[in-house]
């Protein structure tokens, strides 16, 4: 009833299979599916997949006032490319982490953990790699890490998905 598209990892609700019993709402570990009483269906964000299919970022990414979201495609760790922005943040610098890795769902959304939140909370949300991620993020200026600072500066700079960047 809830499925992940293999081509881009977007998770959708199959309206033909997920009826008005609200089991899809209860089944979502991230609590992102809601029941719409007007249509008697379970619904969730569709990640603007029609835009993604044309190479554009989802609307919430493009309109993010904090410019903290970047959409794109990520490779497996063994195929990570340093010129792919998301590979660089997730696999090379390891500052972008999945939310609730203990669920074992292999999410396609990664976050740079907040630095002004209690460590006990961020460890619960992001797992054991969070301490190193926060340390790398905090020290990037003093370490003069121009690649990382430059890449983070690209967040929100375009409405298109970035698949490559030149260091």
Regions found by a protein language model. Name each.
Residues 1-17, 23-40, 56-80, 97, ...:
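Iron-sulfur cluster-binding cysteine motifs and their immediate structural context
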Residues 43-46:
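Membrane-embedded catalytic interface detector for glycan/lipid assembly enzymes
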Residues 66-167:
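Long, compositionally biased charged/polar accessory segments in the mid-to-C-terminal portions
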């Amino acid at each position: 009833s809830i499925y992940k598209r293999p081509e881009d990892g977007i998770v959708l609700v199959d309206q033909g299979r997920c009826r008005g019993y609200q089991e899809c709402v209860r089944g979502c570990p991230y609590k992102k599916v809601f029941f719409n009483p007007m249509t008697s269906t379970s619904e969730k964000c569709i990640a603007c997949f029609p835009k993604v299919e044309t190479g554009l970022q989802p609307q919430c990414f493009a309109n993010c006032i904090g410019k903290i979201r970047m959409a794109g495609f990520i490779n497996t760790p063994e195929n990570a490319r340093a010129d792919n922005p998301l590979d660089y943040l997730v696999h090379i610098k390891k500052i972008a982490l999945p939310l609730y890795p203990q669920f074992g769902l292999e999410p396609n959304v990664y976050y740079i953990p907040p630095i002004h939140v209690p460590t006990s909370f961020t460890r619960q949300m992001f797992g054991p790699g969070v301490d190193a991620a926060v340390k790398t993020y905090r020290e990037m200026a003093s370490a003069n890490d121009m690649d990382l600072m430059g890449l983070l500066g690209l967040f929100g700079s375009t409405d298109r998905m970035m698949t490559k960047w030149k260091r």
